[in-house]
Amino acid sequence: FGIGKLQDNYFQSSVINFEEDRSDRSLYRLIGGSISFYGSTLNSRQYATKGYNEKLIAQIFTGKERYKPGNPAEQPVTQERQSWLQISYMKEAYHSMAPKFVLGWMAEALYSSRNFSENFTATMMQAAEFSPTPHSKLMYNEAFRANQFLAAGIKPMFIFNDMFHLRGEFYGFMPIFPIEKNTQNKAFYGKAFSKVEYMGEVSVICQLP
């Protein structure tokens, strides 16, 4: 259980005059709670090569959004209170296929009944994200955000020794209902299962004892 306040500052256009333009702001005041179940035998919290990890999380939230445009000529908007449920499940596992070769896989599914925010940009910033790699967790990418999605991937690895391994990670991401925007920059749901996005990463990992 928790009480929180979130604030997103953003521009709704890719053409920005930083001397004159002011960012829009969406402020959320929320109350929520969650219950989760975890199980893990991974040999490392990051870049694991053995074991499995599984988690099921259910969350419920209620709150209000206040939108303040960057343009002072426009009036702020406060949305009615909304409540929503979010459920997610993820599992990853690693299997030794040969003395030097490991094959990992992962699958993730998420469902959220959250309504749209005041505009498309605010909606996407608050949508659930698929970020299976450390690098993807640092990046904002609208292509891998949705209120409901399915995702899966494989992780082939070549083990050099106890410290070094070559790791590939390749994922597919499918929003159940992709979030689109209209000409007024408002969000709406597109056709079900109409988009698939892909993500790949290859890296050499050094894990110190």
Predicted regions mapped to residue ranges:
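Transmembrane beta-barrel wall of Gram-negative outer-membrane proteins
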Residues: 1-20
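Short acidic/His/Gly/Ser-rich catalytic and metal-binding motifs that mark active-site loops
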Residues: 7-12, 63-68, 176-180
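Active/binding-pocket-proximal capping segment
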Residues: 124-129, 166-178, 185
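Hydrophobic alpha-helix feature that most strongly marks membrane-spanning transmembrane helices
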Residues: 155, 159-165, 169, 173, ...
